[in-house]
Amino acid sequence: MTEPTQPNAAPQNAVELDDNQIIAERREKLRALREQGVAYPNDFRPTHHAADLQTEYADADKDALETKALHVALAGRMMLKRVMGKASFATVRDGSGQIQFFITPADVGEATYEAFKKWDLGDIVAAKGVLFRTNKGELSVRCTELRLLSKALRPLPDKFHGLADQEMRYRQRYVDLIVTDEARKTFVARTKAVSSIRKFMAEADFMEVETPMLHPIPGGAAAKPFVTHHNALDMQMFLRIAPELYLKRLVVGGFERVFEINRNFRNEGVSPRHNPEFTMMEFYAAYTDYKWLMDFTEQLIRQAAVDALGNAAITYQGRELDLSKPFHRLTITQAIQKYAPQYSDAQLADGAFLRTELKKFGVDATQPAFLNAGIGALQLALFEETAESQLWEPTFIIDYPIEVSPLARASDSVDGITERFELFITGREIANGFSELNDPEDQAARFKKQVDQKDAGDEEAMYYDADYIRALEYGMPPAGGCGIGIDRLVMLLTDSPSIRDVILFPHLRRED
């Protein structure tokens, strides 16, 4: 038995041909298949998966497999092919992994063997046969039946170079998943992380719910919404920027622990950390506060890492990070002074000094969001310039100013701040939570201030939501709520530098 000696060699000589010529040749092969009968059959049913066989029989030697004589049926995409006289090999990948097919005319018949020679990389093929181990130790299927299930008309990228164009990887994710192992691993890890979160929430007695994606009033976050029109109702609608106000309505209604994992939409810029459509998990729990939320969020993220990766100790962009260790907690001013110790307490309490300092960082203090900004908002802006990117280890930044936290409960002990936190890991915001404001009169007053800011030109300021105020007037129990960015969390867990790496089909400019 002769086996391939270069299992990773470039596919045939097709890479040297023009793609259009290759496609034309493959269309001609498809035309011939149509003339022979059903070109795309759908009557083959696999009995096994490649990864299961590789795992179960990893330690089985040739003799053991020969004695067992396990009959299998597998199907998948042909990734490698070697035609070598009277014996040929094909590496086939299914949804779980890959396995080698061993094909001879004596086993499958001369006609099938000759047909196989004309098949191309990327074709979906199927085989029945007996599991065995080759002389070189490769677990393989000795094919007794071999079929072509789906003809691939376009060639796969060169095995060695793959999809070198990063944008092409995002635009043609279906090809990226075929040829890039890391891409497949990333999205498997994403699914495991989300499943872990759902399990964690269920075990903590949270109920998963679904709230509207089309809102009559955008609310729950400071952001620019996408605007659309409902024809039948003849009314303007907004794609949701956050589910928060609807979830808290459910807390009013008596569902004391609720959560939702779904998409939010924000009509803003695109960056390695931002996509206009992104996935968030928000949860609300009656009779809790922001301190409870921090403990709970820390446990949730740690468990998601373990379930997705098998370990809470990870590596991100070449640096180690241990999510099993307790997360840090700092106030905004503590964080500034930790990473920019040149600032004194007196300077951080001086509005004029802060405005001058922010100008040095290129922050326009005359923009609407800063025109009437108090000390707290200015401190937050300085924090974003000096400390935020330095927060590599998991750190809760706590006690946010009330003027930038219109939905959070005010502190009982310190004027001007709220019981709010944001969680940063590797310099990125991962979560935002707070003790909920359940005083309807206070909430109404804060909404009015937001309206004033919007009238002054702040496009991200919130609208006044009269129905939400009405809901609060029925009485909402004290509660805590938190939002976790699923995409950013998955970036962290999969060592992905861009949010586009963890979204299957990220938004891109139109193709020319």
Swiss-Prot record:
What are the GO BP annotations of this UniProt entry?
lysyl-tRNA aminoacylation
HAMAP family the record matches: Lys_tRNA_synth_class2
**Keywords attached to this entry:** Aminoacyl-tRNA synthetase, ATP-binding, Cytoplasm, Ligase, Magnesium, Metal-binding, Nucleotide-binding, Protein biosynthesis
Protein name, as recorded? Lysine--tRNA ligase
**How is this protein annotated for GO cellular component?**
cytosol
Query: Do you know which PANTHER family this protein is assigned to?
Result: LYSINE--TRNA LIGASE, CHLOROPLASTIC_MITOCHONDRIAL, LYSYL-TRNA SYNTHETASE
Gene assigned in the entry: lysS
Cofactor descriptive note: Binds 3 Mg(2+) ions per subunit.
User: Which Gene Ontology terms cover its molecular function?
Assistant: ATP binding; lysine-tRNA ligase activity; magnesium ion binding; tRNA binding
The family line of this record is: Belongs to the class-II aminoacyl-tRNA synthetase family.
Alphabetical list of Gene3D superfamilies matching this protein:
Bira Bifunctional Protein, Domain 2 (3.30.930.10), Nucleic acid-binding proteins (2.40.50.140)
- In Pfam terms, one family for this protein is tRNA_anti-codon
Cell compartments where the protein resides: Cytoplasm
Q: So where does Mg(2+) 1 get bound?
A: 422, 429
Q: What domain of life?
A: Bacteria
Major subcellular location class: cytoplasm
- The record lists Mg(2+) 2 as bound by 429
